[in-house]
A protein has these predicted regions:
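Extreme N-terminal, non-catalytic leader segments
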Residues: 1-8
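Extended alpha-helical targeting/anchoring segments
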Residues: 185-681
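Conserved lysine of the Walker
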Residues: 18
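Conserved nucleotide-sensing/catalytic segment adjacent to the nucleotide-binding pocket
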Residues: 36, 44-90, 94-95
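Hydrophobic positions on the alpha1 helix immediately C-terminal to the Walker A/P-loop
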Residues: 21
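P-loop (Walker A) phosphate-binding loop of NTP-binding proteins
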Residues: 13
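NTP-dependent small-molecule kinase module
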Residues: 1, 109, 113, 130, ...
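ATP-dependent NMP and nucleoside kinases share a basic, alpha-helical "lid"
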Residues: 85-132
Length: 681
């Protein structure tokens, strides 16, 4: 008897392409492993034998193989319509079982991975009849009826670890193999395949061009289902080598296309990763999944490239991931995290006025370089028609927002917050609410372009994950971790609106700069973040390099501090991130007890608002912004779309309710005024 094998079931309806997929998957796995392959069609007892065949398969094939023993089974003679000879399937390091019912309920306890193969009904019928000819045609309907009956009682589709759309392009075997590597149950045995994927080579080109970023993004990724633009839209306003200029030096444009492209969505403990035609689902905490994929494929940065992003994951983390960092479990209307893996990207270096094209070496890399090079050239000297196409006019009908909390309700919650503070349950509570509207005919792309023009910011971003769109003009860095372990947080606490009158604007800035209340709020969050970073920092490395500085943006003045630290060598970076998440500037202090209070006070989940947007690079670097000043466009499940804009402010013992309410109106103004909308009365 040999050790128990890893058993992979390839299931799906007749004609879905299971046999071809299983054979080609086995061929790929045989490069590093001994593989046995079993086809259920060899054991079904006739055209009416689906359920008896599954029973035979489980009892005579799967049970012995699962314990490392040879399986002796009786085949079916399809021409003579009775049992054929005795056959033996030997155990191996990996066993693939394929056919309708391969992952049936009785089989699943003995399986390590379940792959469900999907294909449209017409394609399945054509494929099956092409394979089996006139022999199968009279039985197609009766066999399909047996499948229907089985699937009506067996939740095999929902139980699948991987679901694959078996396309005609032949991509399914490679996509499934890549998806299998995400499954803890088979990842260990696939270490040779994982090692091969980790030996990645980064190719690059440097172009001395200054393209129009919006036109370039639209040209390369305007039709991509998933795409991300991390947009330092205020770069022209902060030239030089100051901290503000450093934050605004790079913009990153990417999608999940190409050989290495993937996307990941996380909801309430389940992570779904799509690689081409295959989607793999794994249960467990998001930050544990992130730890398994972030910084595991070190690549060397190109010579002369100063950026920290060397390809990797980009997207957002939602506020409700706090369930993994000490907060309560609150369901969100949007995925708790959405990321794409960019195996190729365009990086704009605004300081050096250059463009970097980055791509992992792959068969399709050269073609992408040609396309990207041409797009950069076209966006550097665009004609008027190209600009008109990429930069549309009106965003759409002006939306009418409502608020989850009326002015009276919000002010009452301010009083409730101050009661919690007086009871000693918190020092500072970052109370928020959400403005909501029907999206109507609003164009998210046009809206974002208007937002970035009117409210340029170092951490602006445009994210598209299918129908979900995020348009952010955030000025606030949550957390940066450099590839060498340097950490930095830059919380914002304290806001004043700008004035068009220079003297009045200067007075507003001075008022913020000298406000004892705002300084107290800011210093409390600085202290919280010092603690958050210290959990994984080298002792003594946590410093405050800037305290309560004032930065001015298009519509607001902000009070900003900077906390620096250095990550302990070997410390898990995803855990260091989790220790600081969500941003203390969006919770208050102390963090965990204050999050509990906020769950009681606030009228619904925050969703993407208060979370983080940014990247997780292959070289283990990350740079994340706090999700504020951000418009979210989300499908409502009925064919429509909703808009949401989160706003809030820090409540302390000496907060004045009217002033706090005016502050959230000020924070909302930049986004609402761009849309032509008003703050709800």
């Amino acid at each position: 008897m040999t050790p128990a094998p890893v058993i992979i079931a390839v299931d799906g309806r007749s004609g879905a392409g299971k046999t071809t997929l299983a054979v080609e998957l086995a061929a790929r796995l045989r490069q590093h492993h001994k593989v046995s392959l079993f086809h259920l069609e060899d054991i079904y007892p006739g055209w009416n034998g689906l359920m008896p065949g599954i029973e035979r398969y489980v009892g005579t094939v799967l049970k012995p193989l699962s314990t490392g023993q040879a399986a002796e089974w009786t085949s079916w003679d399809w021409e003579k319509h009775y049992d054929g000879g005795l056959n033996v399937t030997l155990p191996a390091e990996i066993v693939i079982v394929e056919g309708v019912g391969a992952a049936a309920d009785a089989a699943r306890p003995m399986l390590d991975a379940v792959v469900w193969v999907e294909s449209p009904g017409d394609d399945r019928r054509r494929r099956a009849l092409t394979r089996d000819g006139s022999t199968y045609e009279p039985y197609w309907d009766s066999w399909a009826a047996q499948e229907d009956e089985w699937l009506s009682t067996d939740e095999v589709i929902d139980a699948a670890d991987i679901r694959v759309q078996n396309l005609a392009d032949g991509s399914a075997p490679d996509d499934v193999l890549q998806a299998l590597m995400y499954l803890p149950s088979v990842a260990a045995i696939l270490s040779p395949e994982l090692s091969a994927r980790r030996g990645l080579q980064l190719r690059s080109e440097r172009l001395a061009e200054t393209p129009d970023a919006a036109l370039l993004f639209d040209s390369l990724y305007g039709k991509s289902t998933n795409a991300v633009w991390l947009d330092s839209s205020n770069a022209s306003a902060v030239a030089g080598r100051s901290q503000a200029a450093a934050r605004s030096r790079f913009s990153i444009l990417a999608d999940d296309g190409g050989t290495f492209g993937q996307s990941a969505l996380h909801r309430s403990g389940m992570t779904h990763v799509t690689a081409g035609s295959a989607t793999v689902s794994t249960s467990g905490p998001f930050f544990r999944w992130l730890d398994s994929v972030w910084g595991r494929r070190a690549v060397r940065a190109p010579r002369g490239y100063d950026g920290q992003f060397t390809l990797g994951w980009l997207g957002y983390l939602g506020y409700e991931l706090k369930r993994e960092t000490g907060g309560n479990d609150v369901p969100s209307d949007t995925p708790d995290a959405a990321l794409l893996f960019a195996g190729r990207a365009v990086v704009l270096d605004h300081r050096e006025q250059t463009v970097w094209l980055l791509a992992l070496d792959a068969p399709d890399a050269e073609e992408w370089f040609r396309e990207a090079r041409a797009a950069v050239k076209a966006a550097t000297a665009p004609d008027s028609a190209a600009l008109d196409a990429a930069v549309p006019g009106r965003p759409g009908t002006v939306p009418e927002f409502t608020s989850r909390d009326s002015a009276t309700d919000y002010k009452r919650k301010i009083a409730d917050s101050q009661h919690e503070i007086s009871e000693g349950n918190s020092y500072e509570i970052c109370l928020t609410t959400t403005l909501e509207a029907s999206a109507g005919d609003l164009d998210p792309w046009a809206s974002y372009l208007s937002l970035r023009r009117r409210n340029p910011a170092p951490f602006a971003s445009y994210l598209r994950f299918g129908e979900l769109v995020v348009a952010s003009t955030s000025p606030e860095r949550f957390l940066r971790i450099l590839s060498d372990g340097g950490m930095r947080a830059e919380p914002i606490k304290g806001t004043r609106g700008r004035s068009s009158d220079a003297s009045e604007d200067a007075a507003l800035r001075h008022d913020l700069e000298t406000s004892l209340k705002d300084r107290a709020e800011n210093i409390m969050i600085v202290d919280l973040l010092r603690n958050d970073l210290s959990h994984f920092a080298i002792p003594g490395s946590v410093t405050v390099s800037r305290l309560c500085a004032i930065e001015s943006y298009a519509t607001v003045h902000q009070m900003v501090s900077t906390i620096d630290a250095h990550l302990r060598p070997g410390a898990p970076r995803a855990e260091a991130l989790a220790a600081a998440f969500p941003a203390g500037s969006m919770t208050g202090a102390p963090k965990i007890s204050t999050m509990d209070i906020l769950d009681q006070l606030e009228s619904g989940p925050r969703g993407i608002y208060s979370g983080a947007i940014g990247y997780f690079s292959l070289n283990a670097a990350t740079d994340l912004a706090v999700v504020i000043r951000t418009l979210v466009v989300n499908p409502d499940g009925t064919g429509g779309r909703t808009l949401s804009l989160g706003v809030g402010g820090a409540i302390t013992a000496d907060s004045v309710a009217d002033d706090e309410y005016e502050e959230i109106r000020t924070k909302a103004f930049g986004v609402l005024s761009t849309l032509g909308a008003a703050f709800p009365s």
